[in-house]
């Protein structure tokens, strides 16, 4: 991850578009849904649902195109258009929700009509208030917050303009540096982008709460928890149950990693305390794969350094293109030297070519199991590398532009393993889009939002060391126990390390929406949860002037995050089911479904359902069980768990919570 979590996927429903894409999308005035008749009947309800599907389907391409432009060309003009269009879209949504109330309680509704009426009510992460002025303010704030994140930069003291650093540049430091000062500076630099968002986010949350209350919910958090075919209270209990299943594995991993970091950094990492968040190889400490070299169990058991191979491929391509360019330039301009701009254009060309080649590696896996090739327009219209001439929202996302074959990915691919896995993840969204496009518009979303995030990650579980060797990304790998533990450690640093982070983001938001965390305590509440669940602390002292949640895209982008926690559980269930369908015999961690059409057929059958039925029905058809369950992830990592317990014998695992969550890793505890 391998920061795939990353993925603000654009779900294919007008309601979910407003939720999942950070997209308060613009558009021209929409055809208003027909008002419900005074004495509504089941037939009227069916006609109403059909019209909602038709109206939303007609409006969707324009909204999505406008949102694409707003995220790829961040200017005051595109933000204004985005906000105004978002206001119109929220108005249509508000009308549909209000009109749907006329059909509540009808006894003879067809099941598919009843389900779609429910989806109209709960599918949006941004419930619009009925007051037009509040809707306008909500749309404007959403657009502003999203744009501030995309344009965010850190200017070191005394620096400005071109010397300021964007997220990509700061991530290069966090991901690869081992200099504690450089790491702390980069971490604090990026987290400073959240500070200007704090007041706006408070207003934004308040306006969303107004909309949620009008729908009959206590707050937005309760509305979000209602979207899982169970009561909000039952869903909260379900996430806690799943966390309890996997928590022991996380705590063993934390204990082991903390010990290794203590060996590296000394007392900066307390032997039995919280880990500073900047030392884990990821800007948000959500996945720890970039510190694999510091914690690798057996250094003599072969290399799994995919990033070095990818970087070498990129460098070879760059060298080839530069030689060709210089030869061509010398012939055309004798005695002259190319400008910096000329060389920058060559570099951008190389980045684009490399990015396309990387995307084709991912596409090849999907087509090998029987899914169709992507249309040529995918490579023509996707943004796969950071432009040199403008700010963009580089956070990886997948887009279904028109529900008629125009699918795209927006992502700034880099030559490293993180980007390789992220493109596999995003392509999972793309194929989900294409598979459920035959469903009515309201069903064109995941069975639940965790399903959408799990599709591509299920595929990455087949990127075993043996598979990576076959495609030339690692040297010959051994199949002995040392090599197995190394491979499991590498994967656990992403898959297991992420689990508490995936849960706590929405724990914080739910508490904010309910008022349990007040505006005055935003940062305190944030770090209290990060310390409680992850066992990490801010590397530098924080205050309530800061707004560290704003440094994570999904908060200003308003993308619910529990989906990622769920996806990291169910992707192992999916993987196990597909391995069974493929006839694989062996340990789950060794399964690779590449090229297996039987597994692909079973996968496609699930993808085609979209949200047309309660998710337990969809899950049961693939896995044979109606319950999300952590047993597959525990089975997968059983060898590593045994190793970790052995290594942690005699250590004081776990951590105490500090008296002051904002004070950093060395603050007193009680």
Task: Locate each region found by the language model.
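C-terminal motif of bacterial Sec signal peptides marking the signal peptidase cleavage site
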Residues: 17-20
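Post-HExxH zinc-binding segment in Zn-dependent metallohydrolases
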Residues: 235, 239-249, 446-484
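Active-site-proximal, well-structured secondary-structure segments within enzyme catalytic domains
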Residues: 162-169, 203-410, 480-491, 497, ...
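Post-HEXXH active-site segment of zinc metalloproteases
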Residues: 222, 226, 412, 433-458, ...
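Short alpha-helical catalytic segment bearing the HExxH-like zincin motif
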Residues: 415-426
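N-terminal helix-rich structural modules
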Residues: 33-203, 221, 552-555, 559-562, ...
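Bacterial signal peptide processing site
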Residues: 22-25
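C-terminal, non-catalytic "cap/extension" segments appended to globular domains
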Residues: 27-45, 77-78, 118-120, 219-222, ...
């Amino acid at each position: 991850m391998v920061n795939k979590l990353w993925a603000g996927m654009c779900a294919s429903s007008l309601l979910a578009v407003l939720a999942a894409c950070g997209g308060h999308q613009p558009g021209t005035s929409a055809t208003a849904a027909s008002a419900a008749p005074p004495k509504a009947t089941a037939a009227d309800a069916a006609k109403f649902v059909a019209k909602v599907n038709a109206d939303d389907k007609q409006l969707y391409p324009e909204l999505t195109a406008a949102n694409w432009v707003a995220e790829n060309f961040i200017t005051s003009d595109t933000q204004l258009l985005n906000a105004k269009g978002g206001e119109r879209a929220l108005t249509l949504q508000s009308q549909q929700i209000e009109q749907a109330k006329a059909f509540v309680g009808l006894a003879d509704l067809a099941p598919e009509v009843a389900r779609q009426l429910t989806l109209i009510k709960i599918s949006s992460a941004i419930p619009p208030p009925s007051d037009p002025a509040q809707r306008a303010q909500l749309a404007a704030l959403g657009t502003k917050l999203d744009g501030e994140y995309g344009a965010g930069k850190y200017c070191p003291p005394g620096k400005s303009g071109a010397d300021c650093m964007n997220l990509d540049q700061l991530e290069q430091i966090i991901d690869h540096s081992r200099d504690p000062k450089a790491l702390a500076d980069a971490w604090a630099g990026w987290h400073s982008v959240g500070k200007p968002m704090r007041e706006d986010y408070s207003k934004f949350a308040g306006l969303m709460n107004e909309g949620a209350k009008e729908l009959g919910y206590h707050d937005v958090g309760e509305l979000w928890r209602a979207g899982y075919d169970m009561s909000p209270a039952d869903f909260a209990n379900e996430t806690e149950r799943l966390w309890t299943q996997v928590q022991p594995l996380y705590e063993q991993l934390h204990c082991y990693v903390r010990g290794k970091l203590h060996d590296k950094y000394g007392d900066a990492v307390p032997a039995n305390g919280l880990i500073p968040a900047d030392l884990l190889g990821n800007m948000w400490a959500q996945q720890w794969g970039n510190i694999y070299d510091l914690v690798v169990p057996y250094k003599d058991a072969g290399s799994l350094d995919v990033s070095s191979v990818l970087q070498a491929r990129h460098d070879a391509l760059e060298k080839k293109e530069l030689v060709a360019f210089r030869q061509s330039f010398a012939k055309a301009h004798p005695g002259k030297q190319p400008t910096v701009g000329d060389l920058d254009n060559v570099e951008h060309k190389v980045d684009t070519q490399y990015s396309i080649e990387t995307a084709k590696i991912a596409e090849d896996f999907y087509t090998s199991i029987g899914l169709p090739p992507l249309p040529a327009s995918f490579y023509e219209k996707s943004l796969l590398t950071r432009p040199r001439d403008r700010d963009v929202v580089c956070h990886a996302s997948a887009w279904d532009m028109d529900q008629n074959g125009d699918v795209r990915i927006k992502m700034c691919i880099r030559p490293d393993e993180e980007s390789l896995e992220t493109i596999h993840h995003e392509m999972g969204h793309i194929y989900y889009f294409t598979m459920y496009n035959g469903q009515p518009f309201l069903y064109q979303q995941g069975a639940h939002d965790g399903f959408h995030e799990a599709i591509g990650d299920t595929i990455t579980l087949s990127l075993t060391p043996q598979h990576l060797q076959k495609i030339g990304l690692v040297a010959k790998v051994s199949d002995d126990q040392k090599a197995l533990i190394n491979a499991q450690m590498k994967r656990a640093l992403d898959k297991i390390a992420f689990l508490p982070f995936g849960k706590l983001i929405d724990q914080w938001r739910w508490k904010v929406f309910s008022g349990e965390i007040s505006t005055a305590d935003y940062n305190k509440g944030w770090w209290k949860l990060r310390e409680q669940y992850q066992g990490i602390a801010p590397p530098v002292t924080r205050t309530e002037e800061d707004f560290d949640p704003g440094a994570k895209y999904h908060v200003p982008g308003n993308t619910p995050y529990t989906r990622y926690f769920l996806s990291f559980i169910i992707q192992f269930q999916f993987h196990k089911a597909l391995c069974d369908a493929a006839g694989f015999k062996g340990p789950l961690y060794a399964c690779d479904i590449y090229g297996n059409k039987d597994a692909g057929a079973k996968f496609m059958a699930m993808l085609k359902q979209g949200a047309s039925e309660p998710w337990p029905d969809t899950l049961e058809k693939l896995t044979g069980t109606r319950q999300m369950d952590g047993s597959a992830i525990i089975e997968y990592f059983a060898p590593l768990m045994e190793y970790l317990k052995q290594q942690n014998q005699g250590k004081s695992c776990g951590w105490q919570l500090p008296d002051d969550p904002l004070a950093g890793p060395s603050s007193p505890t009680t």
